[in-house]
Amino acid sequence: WFPANLCLSVNDCVVHWIPDKYVLKNWDVLKIDCGVNYNKWISDAAVSLVVWWELANPLGQALIVATKSALDRSLEYIHNWNSAYEYSRNVLTVMKNAWFSVLEKLTWHWVGNYVHEKPHIYNVPDSSMKKVQLKSWMVIALEPITAVKSRDFFCNEGNWRNLYTEYWDLWAQWEYTVLVTDDGYEILAGLETL
């Protein structure tokens, strides 16, 4: 059970911040993560942005652009019979080349009648992921979750929903719900332009 359809996480809060009375300020990095249940089928999508983009800090902008690029450039590895490892390996490579980190213990996942269906696949690859093969008609939520420096996170004040970067640095996320097809993929949900 989750208490909201919309999570609005700000600055160093990585995921799952439920909207409250916080007033956004110029230069805040905001992640909007939304799940939709339509006829008992779930879609999940997220986007990151900097409040007042034109005046924003260049570090936040660069992190967001790199994160979206990691997702978009890794989509070529989403196709029938490819392993989950290849997608995650490419996400990590793109982020390292941009001098940013990937939060190691957060995952992308299958979706269907529930928002987080198994298996959950880490954005940082390990050899066990080579056994997880993508197959046509699988629906997956691809979501690189990145940070300026942090690779880990913690729960603040015992609240399992609000996860914060280990160094209190900026983070970003971009997420698509994707259908695996015989010859590639189809994006079902998610903002494709920056």
Tell where the protein language model's regions lie, with residue ranges:
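Active-site neighborhoods and metal-handling regions in enzymes and metal-associated proteins
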Residues: W1-L194
